[in-house]
Every structure is written in C-alpha cells, then in structure tokens.
Amino acid sequence: MEVHHHAHTERKKWTHYLWEFIMLFLAVFCGFLAENQREHYIEHQREKQYMRSLLEDLQTDTTTINRVHRRALTQLSFLDSLIELGNHSPAKADDIHKLYFLQGKTTRFLNIRFEDGTSSQLKNAGGMRLIRKEEVAKAIREYWDHIESLYRVRDRLELAGETIADVSSRIFYTGYFIKSDDPLDPVSGIKTGAKFIYDDQRLIAEYINRIATKATRTRIYLAELEDGLRSANNLLQIIKEAYHLSADRRTPLEK
C-alpha cells in the first residue's frame, strides 16, 4: 500500500517580509513626495501669478498717485493765493472777482482710489500664506499701511472742503460762475460785476480760516502721496527682483 506524503512549502524568511514592507513603504513615501512636490509647484505658480497681478496694480497705482499729486499741487497754489487775497480788507471789486475765480478753482475733491483686486485676494483668500519671501510680504504690508493712511488723510481733506461749503454758500452767488464742460475744471471764468451775498468781514474771515485748514490738510495729503509713491516703487522693485519679473519703471513725482 502506497503512502502519500503532503508537500510542504518552504516558509518565507522574516527578511522577505521586511523587504516587502520596505518596498511598500518606499512606494507610498515616494508617492507622498511626488504629491507634495506637485502641491509646492502649484503654490509657487499661484504665488508668482499673484505677484504678476500685483505688479500691474502697482503700475496703475503709481500713475494714479502722480496724477492726484499734480492736481493737489495746483489746488494748493490756488488755496494759498485765496488766503493771501482774502486777508486784504476791505475787498475791492477786482479782488472780489479774483476771489470768485479762486473759489471756483479750489472746490474739487482730490479723490484717490487704489487698485485692490489682487490685494483683496491676498487679504481674504489666504493668499498671503503663499508669499514665501519675507521681504516681499513685509513690503506688501507696509504698502497697505500707506494706503490706509492716505485714505484717512483724504477723508479729513474732504471734511475740510465740506466745512468750507457751509460758509462759501453765504458769500458767493453761484450765478456769477461760468461753468465749463470739463469735470476736472468745472469753472472756466467769472461774470463781470460779481458781488458777495453778505459783505461781512467776520464771515469772510471765517471762510479764509477754513480755506487755511484745507491748505494745511492738502500739504499733509501731498506728503502722504509722496510716501505712498515711494512705498509703491519700493514694492515694485522688490517684486521684480525676487520673482524675476519685468515692468515699466515708474518715474518719480513730476513737479
């Protein structure tokens, strides 16, 4: 009678299982590294895209600052002339005509608005965490601080203009102003025979005092505009160098 023997498979050594584990671990780890590298690449591309967009915003901002600065300088010149002429008492007919003209040249609000599309994304969508370069992040925050400061000074300047309107409406007849079609220069001239509504020296003195306040705030506004422009140009340069981007070089304030 034949006896059948069961075949015995050779047991695998523990080193075999160790190598299987190592190979599996390496496969998972390499996959993790590849995915991590991919995420870093995507974030780096997003960072660079943000910087390109911010660069374009900064170019627009510097143009805006230069434009508003020129207008503020012109208006300040009219304000100073208005103060000097208004302190002459009593005003002659020729002086009244000049005061009307200068009043018409100093009423426009010197508003400014910065491009905030990219900045809003950086602030609200967690974009700042993508900015790996500390020098860039610091320069961006400093620029934002300058913008906020400019807005505060702008609002105070607007308030000064509103307080002037309360008094000027009791001094000047609007009918003597010759209107223009240019929104940037709404008064083109003054009609002959211009008179004050109330030729009251105390009222005129109050008006001139408020004009002086606006002139002071305009000077502060000019200084803030210059600081803002320096900050914008500094940020432009830092971004261009850090990310090897090109942009039109901004010129200093044209005075």
What is each of the regions a protein language model found here?
Residues M1-T15, N36-K255:
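Long, hydrophobic alpha-helical segments that serve as membrane-spanning/inserting helices
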Residues E20-L33:
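Hydrophobic membrane-insertion alpha-helices, especially the h-region
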